[in-house]
Swiss-Prot record:
Region (Disordered): 948-982
GO BP terms: behavioral response to ethanol; calcium ion homeostasis; chemical synaptic transmission; ionotropic glutamate receptor signaling pathway; long-term memory; medium-term memory; olfactory learning; phototaxis
Segments on the Cytoplasmic face: 590-646, 848-982
Function (record text): NMDA receptor subtype of glutamate-gated ion channels with high calcium permeability and voltage-dependent sensitivity to magnesium. Mediated by glycine. This protein plays a key role in synaptic plasticity, synaptogenesis, excitotoxicity, memory acquisition and learning. It mediates neuronal functions in glutamate neurotransmission. Is involved in the cell surface targeting of NMDA receptors. Plays a role in associative learning and in long-term memory consolidation.
Single Gene Ontology MF annotation: NMDA glutamate receptor activity
Organism: Drosophila grimshawi (Hawaiian fruit fly)
Name the UniProt record assigns to this protein: Glutamate [NMDA] receptor subunit 1
Highest taxon of source: Eukaryota
């Protein structure tokens, strides 16, 4: 560890020694004396230059040890050629490292240019202290020139600050067609692009007036200026040209009240400058001594830093050597441009062109008798590190000797207005061929095509038209009203026309017409949002609103089976199953219960039959449907207990069904399907749910900038409509489930059609405002008028008249509050059920009749067969009887003959052959009215015995016999029956 520590210290020591050796070597390689050249305009400047360098050598802050500066000066010659020779012979041959140059303002700029050309050829830096022409900013020509004074065109920066201070938004620029005039215009346009990113009020150039120097008349340009809207004039002109411009402007009364002139330094010195003109004056502009000192110290500061960083080669010595390329001079020029010191003329710094920045200006106000009065300053603010404008507005005397700041713009009284069809705010009606004017409550609103020709004549009326009529009366303006050319409110399109890295927004529709100054005002339901407010002005909202959702009310759908809705399908199935299960259990309980059958007291009759299955099913259905039960009731106690429980179950089921049926068929339908924008079905849109808005509208922009709605917007983007009217029609038809749009329009549609309803609460709250151009003079007047309309109740009157439709809304509410009654549509299923029952009964009776006919035919065939068989059997028996009788007769005859005694023939019943013949009284089948148990018929021989009647014998009702067949008899002899003696 100790060895490593010592090794590190040795490395650090070696590095420090190397740095010190390098610095000593560099310092020893650099020159110790530096000659500074001066091309000055007078002896005082030359003397001050020498004195400044002498004092510099004793200032250790700027001069390193063993370094000495020497001055080499020459007098500026008006002849540029002589100046070139003097520079070569008296400065470059003396090895000057830089040149400070000044000249008289009246001598022109040719001599300083000659010094710049000559020195620049050898890369010798030149510091100008009085040259302010724009040409010196061109580094392709003046490669090594920089200056401690700003060029004239830098006054454009001060213009922007003044416009921002006075809140002027529209200007006219007047400039000469020379290099400086075009430079100040370019500077203004370029700087304004970045300057207005930090301020709220943006100034635009309405008109650019370019004139040739050495004017004789400016009248032609003044005519164009007078028709413009702006009354703020920014002028760059020479003193001579400014005199001509002021002379002609005075003749056209364009220098008096309401006109604002802001001019540069040269124009400020015209001998006819009007009262109220504002101009700029560079601080220390004529202080050559201050600029000489600042230039010398800037040079010393750059050389000192350069000495500490690199080796400086000696300056060139011979002008005749064209091959000299002094790289140290180029490097020294870069060091000079990076200087930033506090000098006698203020903060001294340079831009990339070597031009002075942070130069201070006085704001001059011209008063009576051409007196100049300082009313403000544009100076460097050290704490903030930038320039700051300070103007005392109360000290300014404006044109026409006014103390109040002019509006800076001519307020036109005839405006071009645009609107768009959007019910109920604007109704549009095409004029008929035989119509020449609109109705009293309408206003003409033609539709212009791209070429500007009238395509169609329309009439407009509605909420916004009534507002426009009242507004024009209140603030006193006339107007021409037209419809939006493309029928859209407008949205922006990102374009890159010039190939720049940044995209530019281009607006379409109504907004595009306003941005491109093809219209003065938009009177329509125009939603105020940040995207639009960046490019146009808005009045205070004339109606506050938000975004909501329009949908169709759920219909009172009544299907044929609507009477089954009180119970679910599962419950209906369970009820059906329960009926038959209970019937089966009743049958089993009554069948197997020992008490399920009973006997009559003191009776020897047979037992009654138990409850059969069909009777049990009939009983279960009868109890459930609350129908009378005439027969087939349970006999056993256990079955009757179950029957009572089943009756209670049936009562609960029927009561529940009745209550729920009323709820389903009579109660109000739900008003909406959606709960609002936070409904999960909207946030996670399903295939069977469609929602949409209007393409490029303010609602569309709202969804774009809301991150939490991005998923929903991606889904609905493909469904968006071109117009709101199309979307509303699709909602009515059921093609679109939810239309998201401005609440005012949707509330109007819902009040007009009772089948439509708005869902949920408002979101994205904003307002409708009147759109105007940026900086429009009508903005404040329109805003104040709208506020007065709100206070007076005029806006509320328009709401009731056009949006809410009081009578229609009342009818809808009455319709909603009316108790719902059941109609055929609701109970059609019940009637169909009855019809099915009737049809089923008819079908069953037909089946029964057909079956009975078939049975009767079959029974007849059986009876005929039985009768034939009986007849045949009787015939056979008769033949047998006859044969037997004949045989007996023969035997009898034989016996008689044998015994000669009388004989008899027996006709008694043959009991052995027909043992049950005496019991037949008819078929043993029950007759209607018989008891539940049919008793067997007793023998008729018991009747009359001992005085017993049929009812006492237990016969009950006796069946009358029809044509009873006589018993068959066979002849024969018997000992216990009567016989017939023949």
């Amino acid at each position: 560890m100790r060895v490593a520590f010592i090794y590190r210290w040795l490395l650090c020591g070696a590095a420090i020694v190397n740095v010190l050796v390098a610095q000593r070597h560099t310092a020893s390689d650099n020159p110790s004396t530096y000659n500074i050249g001066g091309v000055l305009s007078n002896s005082d400047s030359e003397e001050h230059f020498r004195t400044t360098i002498a004092h510099l050598n004793f200032d250790q802050q700027y001069v390193p040890r063993k370094v000495t500066y020497y001055d080499k000066t020459i007098r500026m010659d008006k002849n540029p050629i002589k100046t070139v020779f003097n520079v070569c012979d008296k400065l470059i041959e003396k090895r000057v490292y830089a040149v400070v140059v000044s000249h008289e303002q009246t001598s022109g700029d040719l001599s300083p240019a000659a010094v710049s050309y000559t020195s620049g050829f050898y890369s010798i830096p030149v510091i100008g202290i009085s040259s302010r022409d724009a040409a010196f900013s061109d580094k392709n020509i003046h490669v090594s020139f920089l200056r401690t004074v700003p060029p004239y065109y830098h006054q454009a920066d001060v213009w922007l600050e003044m416009l921002s201070h006075f809140l002027y938004t529209k200007v006219i620029i007047i400039h000469s067609s020379d290099t400086d005039g075009r430079a100040i215009l370019g500077r203004f346009q370029t700087t304004s692009q970045t300057y207005y990113d930090d301020v709220d009020v943006r100034a635009t150039v309405e008109l650019i007036v370019e004139f040739e120097p050495k004017l004789e008349s400016f009248t032609e340009h003044l005519i164009d200026m007078k028709t413009a809207q702006s009354r703020v004039y920014l002028m760059y002109a020479s003193t001579e040209d400014a005199q001509v411009i002021f002379r002609d402007a005075g003749e056209y009364n364009m220098t008096g009240e309401g006109h604002v002139w802001i001019v540069t330094e040269q124009a400020l010195h015209a001998n006819n400058t009007p009262d109220g003109v504002l101009g700029l004056q560079l601080e220390h502009a004529h202080s050559d001594k201050g600029h000489i000192r600042d230039s010398v110290y800037v040079l010393a500061s750059a050389i000192k830093e350069m000495i500490s960083n690199e080796t400086i080669a000696e300056a060139p010595k011979d002008c005749g050597d064209s091959a000299v390329n002094w790289e140290s001079g180029k490097r020294l020029f870069q060091y000079l441009k990076s200087r930033n010191i506090t000098g006698e003329t203020g903060q001294v710094a340079f831009d990339d062109n070597g031009d002075r920045i942070y130069a201070g200006y006085d704001v001059i106000n011209i008063r009576e008798h051409q007196k100049q009065h300082v009313v403000g300053k544009f100076s460097y603010d050290s704490p903030r590190g930038k320039m700051r404008m300070r103007i005392n507005d109360s000290e300014i005397i404006w044109g026409g000797k006014q103390k109040r700041k002019p509006e800076g713009i001519m307020i036109p009284t005839h405006l071009k207005l645009l609107t768009i069809e959007e019910k109920p705010f604007v109704y549009v009606r095409r004029m008929g061929d035989d119509e020449f004017r609109c109705e009293p409550d309408e206003r003409p609103c033609p539709l212009f095509n791209a070429s500007g020709a009238t395509a169609n004549e329309f009439c407009c009326r509605g909420y916004c038209i009534d507002l426009l009529i009242e507004l024009s009366k209140r603030i006193n303006f006339t107007y021409d009203l037209a419809l939006s050319p493309d029928g859209q409110f407008g949205h922006y399109i990102l374009r890159n026309n010039s190939g720049a890295m940044t995209l530019r927004k281009e607006w379409t529709g109504l907004i595009g017409e306003l941005v491109n100054e093809r219209a003065d005002m938009i009177v329509a339901p125009l939603t105020i949002n940040p995207e639009r407010a960046e490019y146009i002005e808005f009045s205070k909202p004339f109606k506050y609103q938000g975004i909501t959702i329009l949908e169709k009310k759920p219909s009172r759908s009544s299907t044929l089976v609507s009477f089954l809705q009180p119970f679910s399908n599962t419950l209906w199935i369970l009820v059906m199953v329960s009926v038959h299960v209970v019937a089966l259990v009743l049958y089993l309980l009554d069948r197997f219960s020992p008490f399920g059958r009973f006997k009559l007291s003191h009776s020897d009759s047979n037992e009654e039959k138990a409850l059969n299955l069909s009777s049990a099913v009939w009983f279960a259905w009868g109890v459930l449907l609350n129908s009378g039960i005439g027969e087939g009731t349970p006999r056993s106690f256990s079955a009757r207990v179950l029957g009572m429980v089943w009756a209670g179950f049936a009562m609960i089921i029927v009561a529940s069904y009745t209550a729920n049926l009323a709820a389903f068929l009579v109660l109000e339908r739900p008003k909406t399907k959606l709960s609002g924008i936070n409904d999960a079905r909207l946030r996670n849109t399903m295939e069977n749910l469609t929602c949409a808005t209007v393409k490029g509208s303010s609602v569309d922009m709202y969804f774009r900038r809301q991150v939490e709605l991005s998923n929903m917007y991606r889904t609905m983007e493909s469904n968006n409509y071109v117009t709101a009217e199309q979307a509303i029609q699709d909602v009515k038809k059921g093609k679109l489930m939810a239309f998201i749009w401005d609440s005012s329009r949707l509330e109007y549609e819902a009040s007009k059609d009772c089948e439509l309803v708005t869902a949920g609460e408002l979101f994205g709250r904003s307002g409708y405002g009147i759109g105007l151009q940026k900086g429009s003079p009508w903005t404040d007047a329109v805003t104040l008028a709208i506020l007065e309309f709100h206070e007076s109740g005029f806006m509320e009157k328009l709401d009731k008249q056009w949006i809410f439709h009081g009578h229609v809304q009342q009818n809808c509410e009455l319709f909603e509050k009316t108790p719902n009654t059941l109609g055929l549509k609701n109970m059609a299923g019940v009637f169909i059920l009855v019809g099915v029952g009737i049809a089923g009964g008819v079908g069953l009776i037909i089946i029964e009749v057909i079956y009975k006919k078939h049975q009767v035919k079959k029974q007849k065939r059986l009876d005929i067969a039985r009768h034939a068989a009986d007849k045949w059997r009787g015939t056979i028996e008769k033949r047998k009887t006859i044969r037997a009788s004949l045989a007996m007769q023969r035997q009898y005859n034989v016996g008689l003959m044998a015994t000669h005694a009388p004989g008899t023939i027996s006709l008694a019943v043959d009991k052995r052959r027909y043992p049950r013949l005496g019991q037949r009284l008819g078929p043993e089948r029950a007759w209607p009215g018989d008891g539940a148990d049919v008793l067997r018929i007793r023998r008729p021989y018991d009747l009359g015995k001992g005085g017993l009647t049929a009812s006492q014998l237990g016969l009950g009702k006796t069946r009358p016999q029809q044509n009873p067949l006589p018993p068959r008899y066979s002849p024969g002899y018997t000992s216990d029956v009567s016989h017939l003696v023949v």
